[in-house]
């Protein structure tokens, strides 16, 4: 925000126009009916319903590109960031989920699953998905 505070109204408008003109990435369909190749893909694409864990893409959109403000993008985020957020929900230190959807999911994941899912989504660019 310090940089944004230094901009004039005209510069803010110019940056806004430039960003608005950029094309949004087109989501690529994720073929969830195909067999995942590892446990991280299974959780990301199909979930672990026997443990009440929905597929990540059920809420976060095809290939984890995000859906509105409520379900941010996962694809292309750093694995360390994603793992840190999941671990914050696991430990109860993150509370910005009014219905505790992510808290329930994160607490149901093992430490290994947290790292694997974070690494999987970090490997996606947001424009590709490899089921």
Language-model segments: which ranges?
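C-type cytochrome heme-c attachment and multiheme electron-transfer modules
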Residues: 11, 44-49, 54-57, 111-113
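Electrostatic cytochrome c docking/interface patches
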Residues: 21-49, 126, 131
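C-terminal functional regions that serve as terminal interaction/effector modules
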Residues: 80-84, 88, 93-131
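Short loop/beta submotifs within extracellular cysteine-rich repeat domains
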Residues: 11-14, 24-25, 49-52, 65-67, ...
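Extracytoplasmic/secreted proteins, especially bacterial periplasmic and envelope-associated proteins
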Residues: 2, 10, 14, 39-43, ...
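Hydrophobic, ordered structural segments
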Residues: 1-29
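The canonical Cys-X-X-Cys-His
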Residues: 15, 53-63, 117
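Gly/Gly-Pro-rich "capping" loops immediately C-terminal to redox-active cysteine motifs
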Residues: 1-7, 57, 61-91, 103-108
